[in-house]
């Protein structure tokens, strides 16, 4: 599997920017999630990787909720560019 096929244009644009920014972390978590979901198409019973996927999903969800609280405009722009669903508010 080629890692570069999962790295989006957004990740390339933000490579020069701050790697500690919330947006960059969300993009990198999204790339990891997409890589793991394609891995599960072949390896359905890889339970340790499924646990890792759930952990990454939780981290991304926490970062998305933080970004939604701090800057709603950047949050909306990021989820539209990454093509992910908006989180449900409680």
UniProtKB/Swiss-Prot annotation:
Q: Which CDD domains match?
A: S15_NS1_EPRS_RNA-bind
Its principal location?
plastid
Q: What is this protein called?
A: Small ribosomal subunit protein uS15c
InterPro entries in the record: Ribosomal_uS15, Ribosomal_uS15_bac-type, uS15_NS1_RNA-bd_sf
PROSITE patterns, per database record: RIBOSOMAL_S15
GO process terms (BP) = translation
Q: Could you tell me which species this protein originates from?
A: Manihot esculenta (Cassava)
Question: What UniProt keywords apply to this chain's record, in alphabetical order?
Answer: Chloroplast, Plastid, Ribonucleoprotein, Ribosomal protein
In which compartments does the protein localize? Plastid, Chloroplast
